[in-house]
A protein has these predicted regions:
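Conserved short beta-strand edge segments in small beta-sheet-based binding/regulatory domains
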Residues: 221, 257-273
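Proline/glycine-rich low-complexity loops and linkers
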Residues: 50, 78-163, 167-184
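Glycine-rich phosphate/diphosphate-binding loop of Rossmann-like nucleotide-binding domains
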Residues: 1-41, 46, 248-249
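Structural motif
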Residues: 6, 63-64, 130, 136-137, ...
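An accessory alpha-helical subdomain
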Residues: 153-253, 257
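N-terminal small/polar loop signature for handling phosphorylated ligands or for N-terminal nucleophile
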Residues: 25-86, 92, 103-106
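Glycine-rich beta-strand-to-loop/alpha-helix junction loops that act as flexible
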Residues: 10-12, 67-75, 163-164, 224, ...
Length: 273
């Protein structure tokens, strides 16, 4: 059985609307391509107290959680510090992170044709990006070598921290999936089967939904209302989703009951998750 996957997107710029989040859709895509699914997503500003609480909850779970943003070295970057507080450990300069940061410093100096001085004040400050919670491991960054980090939570969780830049975060998340999660790929194929019930009201469909879930406990029933559609008008997409071997029986009961009750049914939709 695969674990639950979660996402924490950090940054005041997301909540204020200065930047639009691109991570949610991409993480859903990366997981879906591997037969996995996102269970939840949290959005948190650069508020140390709220961020610490969010990460404590993630750490206490048994989930795999990706956290994007706030791991830089400016005063508004609070994710590294909040992660350490959430885990009850101190921050410490990770030796591999130090080496990678200095490698990046040397690369930039070489590109500019300048001497490399690791003791210069700004270069010493850059080492703060390698201050990770004690016990953390390196998360490689193929874009510019400045690493993220991964931590184990007391509940058995795995927390993976990346920069907020999509060009860095997405390949880092993909690296975690390929190197840490491959044994869960396509382990439990999921599907959904639904139908558009035209002119229906959710209240009238609720008893049927409850009955299907009682009869098929491994399957979830869903309803998605649309108020006005240019072709189908007001309707409800009613369906079942779950393991591929469990959905057909639940679907047959659902559609038979709809036909028996005289519901006006439109197109059916089948989707592999």
């Amino acid at each position: 059985m695969s674990p639950k996957f979660g996402l924490v997107v950090v940054g005041d710029e997301i909540l204020s609307g200065k930047r639009m989040d691109k991570h949610l859709g991409k993480v859903i895509e990366l997981l879906g391509a591997r037969g996995l699914a996102l269970s939840y997503a949290d959005y948190v500003g650069d508020d140390p107290e709220r961020l610490t609480t969010t990460l404590q909850r993630a750490a206490a779970s048994s989930d795999i959680v990706f956290c994007t943003g706030g791991i830089g070295a400016t005063p508004d970057d609070q994710t590294r510090q909040s992660a350490a507080r959430a885990l009850g450990v101190a921050l410490a300069l990770h030796p591999e992170a130090k080496a990678l940061i200095q490698e990046r410093i040397a690369d930039v100096a070489r590109e500019k044709g300048e001497p490399c001085d690791f003791e210069r004040a700004d270069n010493l400050h850059r080492l703060n990006m390698g201050m990770f919670p004690e016990g953390a491991s390196i998360l490689p960054n193929p874009f510019n070598k400045i690493p993220g980090f991964s931590c184990q939570g007391p509940g058995g969780s795995a927390l993976h921290f990346t920069p907020g830049f999509p060009v860095m975060a997405w390949p880092m998340i993909e690296w975690v999936l390929e190197n840490k999660c491959a044994h869960w790929f396509h382990l439990a194929p999921q599907m959904e089967h639904s139908v558009l019930v035209l002119g229906a009201m959710e209240a009238a469909l609720t008893p049927l939904m409850e009955r299907i879930e009682r009869h098929h406990p491994q399957v979830r029933v869903f309803s998605l209302p649309t108020v006005s559609h240019p072709v189908h008008g007001s309707h409800i997409e009613l369906g079942v989703k779950g393991p591929v071997e469990r959905v057909p029986a639940a679907w047959e009961e659902l559609i038979a009951d709809l036909h028996h009750s005289g519901a006006k049914c439109g197109p059916e939709l089948v989707r592999t998750l």
